[in-house]
């Protein structure tokens, strides 16, 4: 039975999968859009949406509850490992989505990769 088997393992062990998701998140925060396989894009979308949700919460409460805002920034830093990206996520990307509940990213299927025929998609942050 496949109960509670929601996530795709991507044929990788746990630490490799976490590293892959972290790298996808770093690239999309830095560049705004990335091209990858469709399966990686769909799994990465879930991961990135959670990070952006934390960033939006940190942005909304930065004036009222300083401690909680700092705690959320530290959680983002633990996931990303780069202060510049955390600052960009909270200060530049999060303000665009304060009135939005989810749906911060989109996956657009592009076609097949020429070398191996893998289905390729573009993962981008919605403007």
UniProtKB/Swiss-Prot annotation:
What do the Gene Ontology cellular component annotations say? cytosolic large ribosomal subunit
- Example of a GO MF term: structural constituent of ribosome
Q: Which Gene3D superfamilies match?
A: Ribosomal protein L17
- Keyword set, alphabetical order: Ribonucleoprotein, Ribosomal protein
Which Pfam families does the protein's record reference?
Answer: Ribosomal_L17
InterPro entries from the UniProt entry: Ribosomal_bL17, Ribosomal_bL17_sf
Q: Where is the signal peptide?
A: none
What domain of life is recorded for the organism? Bacteria
Gene Ontology BP annotations: translation
Family label: Belongs to the bacterial ribosomal protein bL17 family.
Subunit field text: Part of the 50S ribosomal subunit. Contacts protein L32.
Name the UniProt record assigns to this protein:
Large ribosomal subunit protein bL17
Q: Which organism is it from?
A: Fervidobacterium nodosum (strain ATCC 35602 / DSM 5306 / Rt17-B1)
Query: From which lineage does this chain's organism come?
Result: Bacteria, Thermotogati, Thermotogota, Thermotogae, Thermotogales
